[in-house]
Amino acid sequence: MKFAEYERAVAETDILDSQDLVLPMLGLAGEIGSLAAQYKKIQRDHTGYRAFSDEVREELGDLFWYATALARRCNLSLEEILSDNVRKTRERFLRPATPPPHLLFDDSAPPSQQLPRSLDITFTDSLVEGKGKSPVQTVRIYRGNNAVGDPLDDNSDDDDNYRYHDVFHLAHMAVLGWSPVMRSLLKMKRSTDRDVDRIQDGGRAIAVEEGMTAYVFSMARAHSFFSTAAAIPAEIVKACQAMTAHLEVSRRSAQDWEYAILAGYRVFEELTANKGGTVHLDLHARTITYSVPRSGDAEGE
């Protein structure tokens, strides 16, 4: 039986109030409780309880009935719900080891306004006098011998290494092909297209990326900065997608975001452990990798 046929057939048996959402929800909760009760029975009598499979089949059928009733009251199609769930779970749990190739957002822009397809950025970490009561640990980033952006410290009472957070923008650039922050710092805004310059590369997009990066960092602290994680909590990925829903990066998938976040925090861990180093980006391969500091890098250039 197809799901659409099932939905039509059980609709005739739905005698609950058509506006009431509570009863279908309570029904779902009740069926979950019944399944748990069946599990308890088989745990108590492993060999003697022979009705387990039949009872589970019936409880699952009732669970589907209540799920369909709830979907109907929310004007949702169970078939569409399940189709979306298949896409989401395959994307989340069947993630290839490396991200597949994709088109870059600025492929049609003049070369001078395209993000560099290959890039090395060096992070230097040094103590700077005069920024506080005590010397402050400060990071500068360089492209070759040229400084990029301003010196950054943690701006926090805690030494949490946020001064290295530009690595997350670089990960967005490498894996997503997107970073309004890095596009601005590298002076590669798409100024020949006024709307793209204003919307995709403008101040709001920059603020969104900075805010999103700070949010993910605050969540990462509770997860040991994802140092042992093979996946990113789904709510973090959903928040990133929600914050960027009006921007071109909305075309990237949850899987893409997961690649970018994991890659960024992997390199962040290496940068902080070694107090600097060089980060290598390849936008075609969608990779961000790390090299240990050269002699003198930790003292600045």
Predicted segments with their positions:
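Flexible "arm" and connector segments at domain edges
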Residues: 1-60, 64-301
